[in-house]
């Protein structure tokens, strides 16, 4: 059983959803980012998505675009990101960690080398937003052969004809992008979320995690009543952008994470 399967099985037994947190590796700098990463599980993150910095994050809104700029300014490349995972894993063997981003940095690093190094570092899965299922043989299949989960994104515009293609080969969980647009955009209505989850469950037994637009503990709780996971990224990254010091960034992110975790954990009581 993979770490992701294990975590979602534990949460199902506890009758609660996962809090899935997204931060960009190296934002605002390596040391601060590593401190945030190490602190997230204790602050209540059940699954961590770690962004791989890229110069052209086209699916991301202003908050995550700026996070990428800050990380790249600090010379955060793929090697540094994988080293960060190794350092995280040295103290945490249980929290699933998924690398999220775009295909270009993986391609430049070398696909075989990336899969091997990611697995060795302790990565559990991948979300590659710009690699469609028609290209499964390029990364999805080799990654899964190596024991990495490959998590697909579905959107409000993914119709019933397209869904089986998107979900074929998916593992770990399904990431439902609840708003058509860029990350950090407005939140979806709860009725829409409910309908989307019901539709996805007709096509897959994988846990469904909802992302894009969740900013408050209250909203995270409402999503957690309806899906297996609530994904929060831009709201956490805003805390880094607003911080006047590294310690303030750490405290801001972990403080909000605790509040979100409280919302998610109390949702089904």
Curated annotation (Swiss-Prot):
Pfam families: Trp_syntA (PF00290). It catalyses: (1S,2R)-1-C-(indol-3-yl)glycerol 3-phosphate + L-serine = D-glyceraldehyde 3-phosphate + L-tryptophan + H2O. Its EC number is 4.2.1.20. Signal peptide: none annotated. CDD domains: Tryptophan_synthase_alpha. Belongs to the TrpA family. PANTHER family: TRYPTOPHAN SYNTHASE ALPHA CHAIN, CHLOROPLASTIC, TRYPTOPHAN SYNTHASE, ALPHA CHAIN. This is Tryptophan synthase alpha chain. It comes from Ectopseudomonas mendocina (strain ymp).
């Amino acid at each position: 059983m993979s770490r992701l399967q294990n975590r979602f099985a534990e949460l199902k037994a506890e009758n609660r959803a996962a809090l899935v947190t997204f931060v960009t590796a190296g934002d605002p700098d390596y040391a601060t980012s590593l401190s945030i990463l190490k602190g997230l599980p204790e602050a209540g993150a059940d699954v961590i998505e770690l962004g791989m910095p890229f110069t052209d994050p086209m699916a991301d809104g202003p908050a995550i675009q700026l996070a990428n700029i800050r990380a790249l300014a600090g010379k955060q490349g793929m090697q540094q990101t994988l080293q960060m995972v190794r350092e995280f894993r040295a103290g945490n063997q249980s929290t699933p960690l998924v690398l999220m981003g775009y295909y270009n940095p993986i391609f430049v690093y070398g696909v075989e080398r990336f899969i091997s190094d990611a697995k060795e570092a302790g990565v559990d899965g991948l979300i590659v937003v710009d690699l469609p299922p028609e290209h499964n043989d390029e990364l999805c299949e080799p990654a899964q052969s190596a024991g990495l989960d490959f998590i697909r994104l579905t959107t409000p515009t993914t119709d019933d004809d397209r869904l089986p293609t998107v979900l074929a080969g998916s593992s770990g969980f399904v990431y439902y992008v609840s708003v058509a647009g860029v990350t950090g955009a407005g939140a979806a209505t709860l009725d829409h979320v409910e309908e989307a989850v019901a539709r996805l469950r007709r096509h897959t037994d994988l846990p469904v995690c909802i992302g894009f637009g969740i900013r408050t503990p209250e909203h995270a709780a409402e999503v957690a009543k309806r899906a297996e996971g609530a994904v929060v990224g831009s709201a956490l990254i805003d805390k880094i952008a607003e911080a006047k010091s590294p310690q303030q960034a750490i405290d801001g992110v972990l403080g909000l994470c605790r509040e979100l975790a409280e919302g998610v954990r109390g949702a089904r009581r």
